[in-house]
Amino acid sequence: MSPGASRGPRGSQAPLIAPLCCAAAALGMLLWSPACQAFNLDVEKLTVYSGPKGSYFGYAVDFHIPDARTASVLVGAPKANTSQPDIVEGGAVYYCPWPAEGSAQCRQIPFDTTNNRKIRVNGTKEPIEFKSNQWFGATVKAHKGKVVACAPLYHWRTLKPTPEKDPVGTCYVAIQNFSAYAEFSPCRNSNADPEGQGYCQAGFSLDFYKNGDLIVGGPGSFYWQGQVITASVADIIANYSFKDILRKLAGEKQTEVAPASYDDSYLGYSVAAGEFTGDSQQELVAGIPRGAQNFGYVSIINSTDMTFIQNFTGEQMASYFGYTVVVSDVNSDGLDDVLVGAPLFMEREFESNPREVGQIYLYLQVSSLLFRDPQILTGTETFGRFGSAMAHLGDLNQDGYNDIAIGVPFAGKDQRGKVLIYNGNKDGLNTKPSQVLQGVWASHAVPSGFGFTLRGDSDIDKNDYPDLIVGAFGTGKVAVYRARPVVTVDAQLLLHPMIINLENKTCQVPDSMTSAACFSLRVCASVTGQSIANTIVLMAEVQLDSLKQKGAIKRTLFLDNHQAHRVFPLVIKRQKSHQCQDFIVYLRDETEFRDKLSPINISLNYSLDESTFKEGLEVKPILNYYRENIVSEQAHILVDCGEDNLCVPDLKLSARPDKHQVIIGDENHLMLIINARNEGEGAYEAELFVMIPEEADYVGIERNNKGFRPLSCEYKMENVTRMVVCDLGNPMVSGTNYSLGLRFAVPRLEKTNMSINFDLQIRSSNKDNPDSNFVSLQINITAVAQVEIRGVSHPPQIVLPIHNWEPEEEPHKEEEVGPLVEHIYELHNIGPSTISDTILEVGWPFSARDEFLLYIFHIQTLGPLQCQPNPNINPQDIKPAASPEDTPELSAFLRNSTIPHLVRKRDVHVVEFHRQSPAKILNCTNIECLQISCAVGRLEGGESAVLKVRSRLWAHTFLQRKNDPYALASLVSFEVKKMPYTDQPAKLPEGSIVIKTSVIWATPNVSFSIPLWVIILAILLGLLVLAILTLALWKCGFFDRARPPQEDMTDREQLTNDKTPEA
């Protein structure tokens, strides 16, 4: 039966295809992130082994060090092909020699070279076992000279009348340098089925007791309750028979079947061994990731009678608590501790968006079967599967505590995985990894599976530091990370004297005629470490006055080179306690620096001089990660502050603004009037700090007031804080009293609350009582807007009747209605503040007694103005004329020309363009008005919104009432509803204006028509008069031409002849 076969009568099917197949399916969830700081696993001199493509080479790994002279790496490749006849991807285990020099290649270990065994059924030979796709090499474990490898998907054909093919699993044991092999298949029997051991998958997990006995996990037995099986390797070898396929070992031990409530628990998913009862007999630890109602738990099992002693239960359902288990004495108290992985743990920071990050639980043993509450380490990367693999490393950095490697194989955006190294301490594990390994060498395949398999606690290169193997089965590679020797440095800085008197100038400055105060500086160091060289060279770097910022004046310099920085080698012999080097340091002249109070910090930074290391296979030493490589010491300048050399100032500060209110939109020039004084001892490097609010800008210091001190002030910015800093003296001596004025502009007030704050304080470099009281000035912000409305009628009056024009009683075109009348209204915000929500309403003289007065054709807006649609605009659906261009008068109005129609705020000011008495005023009190309602948007100071109403005087209405003068009045009003600020003014602007159009009558005129014959007669008479006049002028000789006298011509010719050229 295949793994997906239907379940028996005791519950639902829960197939288990090992983390092997699950891992292959989960490869789409890999993560990777950059490495953090590196500690002592070497990432440069890696030894990388490669296997056949697609073989999952690296799925399982282990060290094989049978004796002091031999070392190798064992690598499982569960999908590899072998030389076994007719077997496809049966899997293999590779032997990879160490060191991997020259052309040395990994080779398959011949655990099994045979085909499937067969039996005769009804005269035909049929296979009784199935080794293709059995995943041999999915687990590999070595103990001294013994090596065990398992195939958890090995299938067995039962001997029932109806045969079934069950994944019972099998293992092979190799001893004596792979010269002898034996098979161990504890779940293979003649009556295998899901209810029994048919789905056992023996070898799913694997470990050894310290005495060499074998521990095998079979999580599929008994309807996937799972079981754990132990046996002696010696018994397996001694009782093995290739032909007796169902032979049972006499000393074999197995956990028994449990009640049905334990189905689908997966006992044996992971196994380990440790001592927890206080005797010399190790116990068995087994992971059960789906037990306890899917919360998962780990059990400690008695190795003698296979009874359950104690459980650790998971905290979250489906977290797969127990996926991995590791036993290690992390805190080095002589008692074994238990680590449990739950790689599917979900972090529920927000219930709506949980993150699968994984967790590790460390149970520290206090005494026999008594453990502390677990220390929990939580992964940081979603779907990283933190805790999918764990490895006991031993004491990686030789600090006396064992360390742990944790695999995060599905980590990072590039899906390359990583391995985190956690160092142990007396309380458990450090909460942050000391090193993060990333699979750059395995980057050509995605996912690479880097970190899915780990193995440590073996020193393959014999340098007294344990090493680590990391498998990346997705890319078919395995890497050996070797631990680097750790060098611990004890460094010291010695200064003499530590208090420097500037007056005691005992050192002659080279290349100068000046003397200076000075002191001696001694740099000393010693080294310790396991397996380090006898001579260690440190590159030492000394920084003088190191707390001064970059670019600041260093108060001290080395006497021999006038520099504040020095790098030099420090050669240390391992046998000697300390080795030292001496220097002389001098102080600059006190006129060159201000700071006399802060300590002169001398810092020493050191590193290993890697140029002294030999090139070769050996890894280079590294400095201890947990020891700071920076040492500092401080010297002090002697100041005149009494016997204790300690100045205690008493700084006082007061301030007030010259105005207590600023207006939004205005320029808002503001001055802060400040008083600073010192009523104590000298304040060194005393400075006034004024924190500038984001709404304000610094203008400068007030210099026109003789009562103010003209201090030196400058604008500075630290991070995002803007400030003005004024120098008050160095020192600001006792009794100092300064007054000064600082000017600011406050232009940016639109997006702030209704006040701004200026924070002020005096600060000095004194150690005790260095600062003054803190002063905070609050200045209120208000909004003020002056709003006006103005308007015009064009034309201001209409004269009736219109010459040669008569209105139509039922007009169809606009021109047939009457004269054009336009009213234009402008809402203008003088400012300075902004208005954001205003209602503008117009009462329009529309009709009286069902007769139209001013008939509207069109409403036009300019600016942030939107009017509501009105059905009474052109209700007769008269065809409108093309809208004419604005007249010069209207254009001038739109350019904000001075118009006599002007109202501000609440005033109502009516101005008549023309008065003719007596004229009857038609307004909204005695006629029917059309209401036009408009919403005005945001108007900054100086901006306007314009409304233009185009209408026609309904001439028919007025021609029926000849000689009666009228004044048609429209009323426009506004009300500001809101300003765009958090707090609104107590009173918002409003106002109105009346615009009139006069209708007057012309004086009657009498018209005369001239007959045509009169016109013709007048023309003929005109022509006759012209002819008589012309004749008279001709008779008088007016048209005769006047000729010049003859003698004049003779004289002219004579003059011409006289002009003969000379010979």
Curated annotation (Swiss-Prot):
Which PANTHER family does this UniProt record tie to the protein?
INTEGRIN ALPHA, INTEGRIN ALPHA-8
Q: How does it assemble?
A: Heterodimer of an alpha and a beta subunit. The alpha subunit is composed of a heavy and a light chain linked by a disulfide bond. Alpha-8 associates with beta-1.
Q: What does the entry give for GO biological process?
A: cell adhesion mediated by integrin; cell projection organization; cell-cell adhesion; cell-matrix adhesion; establishment of protein localization; extracellular matrix organization; inner ear morphogenesis; integrin-mediated signaling pathway
Upper taxonomic lineage = Eukaryota, Metazoa, Chordata, Craniata, Vertebrata
Where do the FG-GAP repeat units fall? 44-105, 122-183, 188-240, 253-306, 307-372, 373-431, 435-498
Q: How does it sit in the membrane?
A: Single-pass type I membrane protein
Q: This chain belongs to which protein, by name?
A: Integrin alpha-8
Keywords tagged on the record: Calcium, Cell adhesion, Cell membrane, Cleavage on pair of basic residues, Developmental protein, Differentiation, Disease variant, Disulfide bond, Glycoprotein, Integrin, Membrane, Metal-binding, Neurogenesis, Receptor, Repeat, Signal, Transmembrane, Transmembrane helix
